[in-house]
Amino acid sequence: MKHQRSTTVLGLTLAAALAVAACGSDDEPAADEPADTEASADTEAPAETEAPADTEAPADTEAPADTEAPADTEAPADTEAPADTEPTDGGEAVSLAGLCPDTVGIQLDWMPEAEHGFVYQLVGDGYEIDAGNAYVTGPLVDSNGNETGVDIQIRSGGAAQGFSPVTTLLYQNDPEDVLLGYVYTDEAIQFSGDFPTIAIESGFEKNPQMIMWDPETYPDVTGIADLGTEGVTIRYFGGAAYMDYFTGSGILSSDQVDGSYSGDPSLFIADEGTAAQQGFGSAEPYLYENELEGWLKPVAYEYINDLGWENYAESIATRPENIETYSECFAGLVPLIQQASIDYLEDPAETNEVILDAVDQFGADFGWDYTPGTAEYGIETIKADGLVANGPDDIVGNFDMDRVNGLIELAVPIYEAQGASPMEGVTAEDIVTNEFIDPSIGL
């Protein structure tokens, strides 16, 4: 499932590349045919929320072509795995030297933004930016700023990778170059047959993807189901599995959904809000209210997760064979990622400076404009709407296996109808694991 988002490109409209592939369909193109991806998760959030604008939107994708997929690998059972540590002056620090690659490569699904803050939180002082490739590389540090003995390289996605889906990039690169990537749960289900991945940390408990509408035009609408009752046209990236779920379950009707959305905000503005549209709750509301000339007023929205498509978003995933090969690495690294999620929520200022520095150095080259106001809105919304949160327990970053199995039950028939080939009999244990989660870390 391709999770794409809408953006302003240097002010208002999308660059041609973004208009073609960015923002929100659920179908990822073949490896030969680049596509943009981005993504979702679960937690309770208000049915309607008024807010400013800039968002992302997911989308389904076809399995990448011309890439060799490894044999099916059984996901490890959920267990607790302590990390080796060594004391330093700044406190007890994890040493990843000799356990992880010298540089831990993480492939993102989009350009730098607040939704990626928890991995940028791991970048220490003295980082370097490769503007041509849109990479940020620096020492991988713990919560106290202690270096762990390895570097981290964060690779931007979207236009920087020719809009290739993260799943494709994980198979096109050696693990020593790209060990991890952002893979949404529904995407993992879609590609589980031919290009399997296993997520080792959940990222976002709740998917930021939403449907938004103009509350002035539709004052009686409080959620997506009301849009269905009113017969409002809803634009989305064609092929999105969640939309097939909405139409198949009767929440929306097939004659009111329009799969022509390309990420360009101009249509929403031009039709004066008579149509609804997909987006990211942590972005578009701010963009539309504060930055898009011609609109500059609030939109209302409801998260897709709240209607039963309980997708985890921005999950940190790897190829299945890496679970055993890099088990000691993950045992030390995953708790650092968990803690980084908490640290970023509590004090995002320094990490946002890294994100904005990256945008300043290479954003324009890839048609990406991201402002300090959008970053601040993003982190505020991530906290307020519970997009990053503990699971049903007191642990951050772990997976609810029943929830994942519930999404599998919904998603497999949809993907098969779309022509994808999910793993026969796929279960939660095939695509996610809590093996490396530290149960003592939570919000």
Residue ranges and their predicted role:
Residues P46-T103, A131:
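N-terminal low-complexity, Pro/Thr/Ser-rich intrinsically disordered segments
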Residues D186-E187, Y261-A364:
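Pocket-lining segment of extracytoplasmic ligand-binding domains
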Residues Y326-Q418:
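Secondary-structure end/capping motifs
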Residues A17-A22:
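C-terminal motif of bacterial Sec signal peptides marking the signal peptidase cleavage site
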